[in-house]
Amino acid sequence: MDLQDQVQRRIDELAGTELGLQVAVYRQGELVVDAVAGDGVTPETLYFAASTGKGASATVANVLVDRGVLDYDRPIVEIWPEFGAHGKDTATLRHVLTHSVGLPALPPGTTRKTLSEQADRLAATEPWWEPGTKMTYHAETFGVLVGEIVRRATGRTISDVLREVLNPLGIEENVFFALPGNQRHRLAQLVEPEGAEETFAMLAGMFEQVVPRAMQPRAAVVNRPELLAIEDASSAILTARGIAKLYAALIGEVDGVRLVRPEAVPVITGPALVAQDELLGNPATLALGYSIGRLGSSADESPATIGWPGMGGSVAWADTRSGVTFALTRTLFDPSGSASAIEIGNLVAKALC
């Protein structure tokens, strides 16, 4: 049984509880798994994938660095002068990409409708620490900061630049930071599992210091297309095939397209920061905009793998050693973990990595 059949059989079994799944795998630029399960789910179904989308915003930034538009170590104030308030004049894109810039908290009261106003407020905010000296996961401010840096450098929104990056790959309708009105019909309606309220409440309390409750993802919120139409580069609305292909073009060549020069790949994907998360307490090994280590394993166990998981159970990763990229999306928006993403990811890694 080939890998396509193995994955298809397993997600068909999982669809009873997961409700819907997409899995896509690229190897050396070739699509080798493209599987879906669940009522109404097709490879073109769009999923709100939460922080899995950070891989797309990081990739936009890295492409712009490779093109000479941005620089990892040039002070942000050179393109965004107001950002230097409260001693942030030494902060760089590298600090933002490694979650060490010291601005993990959205201003209190932020909602999706006011998210576009937060870049100016973050620029005026005192950092939690001197940029680059500590880190904690910038769950929602990551996208605000990367998006504004991209806008200042290019004069365009990060959504516009993302579309430019995606166009040569033919996936410009497969990864979005803001859901266009003409794509609303493709959006999957996520479902929270029964009995999950306690877990959601626990996570809300854990993140409330940095993410106001109105910005914390719940199915009732992210199932509303009008709210997903608001640009948020900390998340994405995507297909598994789209984000897997984006990662494949980052680490190698797909359909004759490379997003960055080959010599840039180890710079982008190698360890850029090893630290203890100041807020969450976990050890973190980060590349330039990505977590190192396959979901379900540590950075030491899978040091050639970069990616991001998303709350609710989606994930996308790329293994630079084997040239394999993997993505999974699902309809069940489960806050308690990503067991299916780990299981199917391990199945793929065992076969190909």
Language-model regions, residue ranges each:
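Catalytic loop of the DD-peptidase/beta-lactamase superfamily, centered on the K-T-G motif
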Residues: 1-36, 44-48, 134, 151-159, ...
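Active-site helix/loop module of the DD-peptidase/beta-lactamase fold
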Residues: 43, 48-52, 64-104, 108, ...
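Active/ligand-binding-proximal structured segments within catalytic/core domains
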Residues: 57
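An acidic site on a long C-lobe helix of protein kinase domains
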Residues: 89-92, 142, 239-242
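Cytochrome P450 catalytic-domain "roof"
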Residues: 125-132
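Cytochrome P450
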Residues: 132-139
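Hydrophobic mid-domain F-helix/FG-region of cytochrome P450s
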Residues: 141-152
